[in-house]
Structure formats: structure tokens, C-alpha cells
Amino acid sequence: MTASPAGKPAGGRERAAQVRTLFSEIAHRYDMLNHVLSLNIDRRWRRRAVAALGWERAPGGSYLDACAGTLDLALELAARPGFRGRVAAADFALPMLVRGLPKIGRAPVAPVCGDAQRLPFAGESFAGATVGFGVRNLSNLQAGFEELHRVLRPEGRLVILEFAVPPGRLLRAAYMAYFNHVLPLVGRLVSGHPWAYAYLPASVRGFPAPEELADLLRRAGFAEAVWFPVSGGIAAIHVAEKARRPGAAPRPGR
């Protein structure tokens, strides 16, 4: 795997190998760095993402968390009062999943080592799916969305939590200064990895804006795709829904 000193993301298969190696190498410090560098605000974002999933429509259903990392988002869903289902937590970086294993306890979460662009599940397997800070790392974004659409049942909902660039001039300037300078420096010092946290701002700068991402979701087959900003627009939550089967009655709770 190769990477520039600035952590510029590669493309295609090289990008996939780069991302897998990167997250495998920082798995041991990933949780701590996430919480510290986000000032713990990432926990609130995950709660809002789970709330947007609408799991109450099928509380005993099967759910997918793709690009699951160390399992925080999967466990957030599994811990909701009234949730009686199961969560398959898929990630192609095995060390990240291993790092999350001690958190599981009795939670109904099953880690699966698998690529979000080639998920090891049959079509229409899940009542809903989540992706937290993961779609930005896919080597083929459209293929990933089409694969998530494939494994969702009709009326299944996909919720994506991802970084964004805030629209306000002052907040954007402060955010980009932190993202481009403070975060890579602190991340490098704490993780010991020479370029992992330089990759993050580079990947965000090259990522589609929320409006473009919603359009890509529609092209992948989702009937509805909306988004809303969180924390002033430094992140966004996208909600997309697979179409109902023709002639089928609406799912209860809509």
C-alpha cells in the first residue's frame, strides 16, 4: 500500500487496500481518538442516527451496520429500550471488529468480516441499515449504495452518518483549521501513525456534498433520500428508503 505524506486517498483497488491497512493499524487507538478529537460529540451523533432509522417499525427485525468499525453504532442500536432484533456488524478491517468484541457482552450484535461493496448476505435480508463515518472510505460509492439497497427489504431504511463541511463562513473557517491542522497533528502524536489522521481531512475534502450524496442514493434505487445537518453542518445524517413492493400495504408505523 502506498500513500502520500498528506494522506491523499488513492483510487480503486489501491484505495480499498489503503483504507483496510490504515484502519487495521490504528484500531487499538481508534475509539479513544474518536471521542477525544470530536470532544465526545460523536456519541450524540450516533444516537441521532439510530433515532432516524425508525427501528420501532420492526423492533424484532434483522439490521445491518456496514463499515461497523469497533461496533459503536451497532451497539447503540442494540441498546435501545424495546429493541428485540439482531444487528449484523460488517467491516472489512478485521482488527477493528476484534477491538470491538469486548464491548458486546450480551448485546444482540454479530460481527462479520465483509466488504460493504460485496456484502455476504442474501438480498432483502435486513429491515434497516446504518453506516457511520464509513461511506467516505468506499472505493466505489455507487457500488456500495447499490449493495446496501440490495440487502434491504422493501421499505427498509438506510441511515448514513458522515462528516460534512459546514455552510457558515466563520464556522467553516474554524472547522477547516481544526480539521486540516489540529486533528492530523494530535492524531499522529496519539496514534503513532504517520499519516492516518491526515487521510481524514483529505477524504472529507474530496467527498460529495450532502445534496450530491442524496442524488447518488436515488440513482442506486432508493425511492426517497433526504438529509439534515447536525452540529451546525459539520456532519450530516442521510435517510434513504427502499421502495415498497407494488400493491403492498404500507408497513405499520409509517
Where are these predicted regions, by residue range?
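Class I SAM-dependent methyltransferase SAM/SAH-binding core
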Residues: 62-118
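Conserved alpha-helix/loop element of class I SAM-dependent methyltransferases that forms part
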Residues: 29, 39-60, 76
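Short glycine-dipeptide loop
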Residues: 59, 83, 152-157
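A short glycine-rich, Lys/Arg-flanked "PGG" loop and its adjoining helix->strand segment in the class I
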Residues: 142-154
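Hydrophobic beta-strand segment of the Class I
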Residues: 30, 129-130
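A short acidic, Gly/Pro-enriched loop at the edge of an enzyme's catalytic core
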Residues: 117-128
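Core SAM-dependent methyltransferase catalytic element
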Residues: 223, 229-254
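C-terminal alpha-helical "lid/dimerization" subdomain adjacent to the S-adenosyl-L-methionine
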Residues: 161-216, 220, 226
